[in-house]
C-alpha cells in the first residue's frame, strides 16, 4: 500500500520535533558533563592528599603494622557490593554493563545467593535486582547530577558502619569509571578492608613535617572511616560523570539517527511527489488524446 504525501510530511515533521528534543537533551548533558568532570578533578586532588597523609602515618618513619580492623582482612562469610546505576534511562548501555557484571559476580562467587549483600545507589539497579528477588540492604534514589557529600553521607556512613559491625566482611563498589566522552570502564573496586596504601609512597621523615599529639591508632580510628567514606564518594562522582557522558552520547546518536530518517523520508517524499506529478501528466495527455 502506497504511503500518501501527507503521511510522509507528517512523519518528517514528527521526526524533526524529536530531533530538536534530543539535540536539546544532548546540550544539557554536555553542560552536566563539564561540571561533573570538574568535580571529579577537584576530588582527585583531595583524595591524593588524604591518601598520602594516611600512607605516611601508617608506614612512615619506620612505623609498625597497625591493628585497626579496617586494615586487616578477615575470614569472608559475606561480601557487600555497592552498585551504582542511574535513576533513569536514555543513557545507552551505561546501566546494562554494570548490572550484567554484578550478576556474573553473583553467579561466580555466590551461586546459592548466600553471602551476597547489596547496597544500591540509583533506581535502575534497585528495581533490576528486586525484580529478580534480590532485596538490597539499603538504597538511594534521586541523586543529583553533581551530588554533594551531604546528599550521600547517610548511605555511605551506614555502609561503612555495617562493615565495622561485621554485617559483611569485605566491601566492593561496582560502577562505570569515566575515561572520556565516548569511553567508560566497568570497575569492581575493593573499598574495605583498605589494602591499597602503598608503603613505598610513605615519607620516611614524616615526623619532621608534623607531630602527632595523640597515638597513631587513635588517629587512624577517626581517619580510616572518613577515608573509606571519601573513596566511596569519589566512586559516586566518577560514576555520575560517566553517566552524563553516556547520556550525551546517547542523545547525540539519537539526533544523528533522526537526521538520517529525515533525509530518507525527504527522498521518499520527493520520489512520491514526482510519481504523482508524472501520473497527473499522463492522465491529462490521455484525456486530451481521447477528445481528438
UniProtKB/Swiss-Prot annotation:
**Which InterPro entries does this chain map to?**
ATP_synth_F1_ATPase_gsu, ATP_synth_F1_gsu, ATP_synth_F1_gsu_CS
- This protein's UniProt keywords: ATP synthesis, Cell membrane, CF(1), Hydrogen ion transport, Ion transport, Membrane, Transport
| GO cellular component entries | plasma membrane; proton-transporting ATP synthase complex
Q: GO: which molecular function terms?
A: ATP binding; proton-transporting ATP synthase activity, rotational mechanism
Mode of membrane association? Peripheral membrane protein
User: What is this protein for, i.e. what is its function?
Assistant: Produces ATP from ADP in the presence of a proton gradient across the membrane. The gamma chain is believed to be important in regulating ATPase activity and the flow of protons through the CF(0) complex.
UniProt lists the family membership as follows: Belongs to the ATPase gamma chain family.
- What is the name attached to this protein's record? ATP synthase gamma chain
- Per UniProt, what is the name of the gene that codes for the protein in this document? atpG
Amino acid at each position: 500500500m502506497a504511503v500518501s504525501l501527507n503521511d510522509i510530511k507528517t512523519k518528517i515533521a514528527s521526526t524533526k520535533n524529536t530531533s530538536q528534543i534530543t539535540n536539546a537533551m544532548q546540550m544539557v548533558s554536555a553542560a552536566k558533563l563539564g561540571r561533573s568532570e570538574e568535580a571529579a578533578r577537584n576530588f582527585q586532588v583531595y583524595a591524593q592528599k588524604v591518601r598520602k597523609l594516611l600512607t605516611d602515618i601508617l608506614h612512615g618513619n619506620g612505623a609498625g603494622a597497625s591493628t585497626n580492623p579496617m586494615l586487616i582482612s578477615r575470614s569472608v562469610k559475606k561480601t557487600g557490593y555497592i552498585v551504582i546505576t542511574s535513576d533513569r534511562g536514555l543513557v545507552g548501555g551505561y546501566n546494562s554493563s554494570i548490572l550484567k557484571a554484578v550478576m556474573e559476580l553473583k553467579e561466580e562467587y555466590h551461586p546459592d545467593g548466600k553471602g551476597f549483600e547489596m547496597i544500591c545507589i540509583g533506581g535502575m539497579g534497585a528495581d533490576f535486582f528486586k525484580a529478580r528477588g534480590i532485596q538490597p540492604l539499603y538504597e538511594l534514589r534521586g541523586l543529583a547530577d553533581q551530588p554533594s557529600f551531604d546528599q550521600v553521607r547517610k548511605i555511605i556512613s551506614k555502609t561503612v558502619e555495617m562493615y565495622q559491625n561485621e554485617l559483611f566482611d569485605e566491601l566492593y563498589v561496582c560502577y562505570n569509571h569515566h575515561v572520556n566522552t565516548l569511553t567508560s570502564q566497568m570497575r569492581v573496586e575493593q573499598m574495605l578492608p583498605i589494602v591499597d596504601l602503598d608503603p613505598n609512597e610513605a615519607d620516611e621523615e614524616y615526623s619532621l613535617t608534623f607531630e602527632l599529639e595523640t597515638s597513631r591508632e587513635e588517629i587512624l580510628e577517626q581517619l580510616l572511616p572518613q577515608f573509606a567514606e571519601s573513596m566511596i564518594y569519589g566512586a559516586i562522582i566518577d560514576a555520575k560523570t560517566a553517566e552524563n557522558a553516556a547520556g550525551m552520547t546517547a542523545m547525540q546518536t539519537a539526533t544523528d539517527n533522526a537526521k538520517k530518517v529525515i533525509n530518507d523520508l525527504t527522498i521518499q517524499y520527493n520520489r512520491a511527489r514526482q510519481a504523482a506529478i508524472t501520473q497527473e501528466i499522463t492522465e491529462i495527455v490521455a484525456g486530451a488524446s481521447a477528445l481528438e
